[in-house]
Structures are given as structure tokens and as C-alpha cells.
């Protein structure tokens, strides 16, 4: 079961419906700050959540998770051994601070500071104002990339999380990327 922290991108839930996968969801609006920990644990302690998905900032409400909330998510992801898929489609577009200078603070807030169980999803289409065809980047922590999971081995015939993600899942779903987006 995948847990969505909403509001988020509704197509992600639709993708799970198409694949026949289960998901649960809650709206973060009433669970900001320390309240987030208790809410997340109410789901995670059941033991059936394999991943947490959220957008930061999100569309359409533009709620931005704070560092403390990202720390809570990261620490609980480690404690309960779940993977965080952090959708950064609007990477560095929280204009309350200037995130536009590469390699200089301040940096894009991310759960990657607080856990090794992460996949960051970054939209190249939005970052480069590229309308039309879509292209993005997935960033997997080294630890998660090299980790083996019995379920993945059973379904895909072996490999680590990273190799299955790239060579089995991502390639099969995208068949590469369009020439113009490259």
C-alpha cells in the first residue's frame, strides 16, 4: 500500500488504480508540524505501507513542507523501512527564498537529508520551461539503489532496487525518452 500526503498530483493515484495497487491518503493541511508525526505513525504502525508519496511544493495549493516536517518523514521512513518518493516537480520554485543559485545556499529542502530511503522525482520539463513532451530525473540514494528486496526478485527475477527500477520498470514504461526532449 502506498501512502499519499495530499494535496498532490492526482495522476499518481490513477496510475496505482491502473496497476491494481492499493493506496491510502490524508490531507496534510490539518497535520502540520509536530502533528504530522502522529498522523504518519497511525498509518505506518499497521505495517502495510511500502512507500510515502508527496509533492513539495505541491500543486494546486502550493503547500511547502518545512524542514522539521521533512525530518519527521525521513526519520519515520527509516524507522518503519518505507521508501519516500519525493515529487519535486516544482524544484526550487518556492520563491519565498532565492533557490536559484546552483551550489550555493539556500538549497531545495528535501527528505534526502534525513533518510537513505528516498527517490527524488524532478521535472526537467518544468525546470527548463519546456512545454509539451515530458522529461524528468529520478535520483535514488546509493543505499537504496544497491538494496535487494525479495519481492522485486520474485517479480522481476533479481537485481537491486536501482537496477530493477532502471532496466525493468522505467525502461518498460517509457521505452527511453523522445529525441526532442533530450
Question: Residue ranges of each PLM-predicted region?
Answer:
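Conserved PLP-anchoring active-site segment centered on the Schiff-base-forming lysine
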Residues: 1-13
Amino acid at each position: 500500500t502506498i501512502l499519499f500526503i495530499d494535496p498532490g498530483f492526482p495522476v499518481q493515484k490513477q496510475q496505482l488504480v491502473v496497476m491494481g495497487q492499493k493506496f491510502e491518503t490524508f490531507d496534510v493541511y490539518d497535520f502540520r508540524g509536530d502533528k504530522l508525526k502522529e498522523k504518519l505513525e497511525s498509518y505506518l504502525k499497521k505495517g502495510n505501507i511500502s512507500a510515502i508519496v508527496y509533492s513539495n511544493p505541491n500543486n494546486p495549493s502550493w503547500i511547502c513542507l518545512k524542514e522539521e516536517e521533512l525530518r519527521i518523514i525521513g526519520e519515520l521512513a527509516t524507522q518503519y523501512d518505507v521508501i519516500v518518493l519525493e515529487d519535486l516537480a516544482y524544484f526550487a520554485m518556492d520563491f519565498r527564498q532565492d533557490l536559484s543559485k546552483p551550489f550555493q545556499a539556500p538549497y531545495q529542502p528535501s527528505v534526502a537529508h534525513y533518510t537513505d530511503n528516498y527517490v527524488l522525482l524532478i521535472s526537467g520539463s518544468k525546470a527548463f520551461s519546456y512545454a509539451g513532451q515530458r522529461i524528468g530525473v529520478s535520483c535514488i540514494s546509493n543505499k537504496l539503489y544497491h538494496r535487494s528486496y525479495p519481492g522485486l526478485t520474485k517479480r522481476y527475477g533479481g537485481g537491486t532496487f536501482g537496477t530493477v527500477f532502471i532496466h525493468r520498470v522505467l525502461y518498460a514504461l517509457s521505452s527511453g525518452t523522445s529525441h526532442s526532449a533530450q
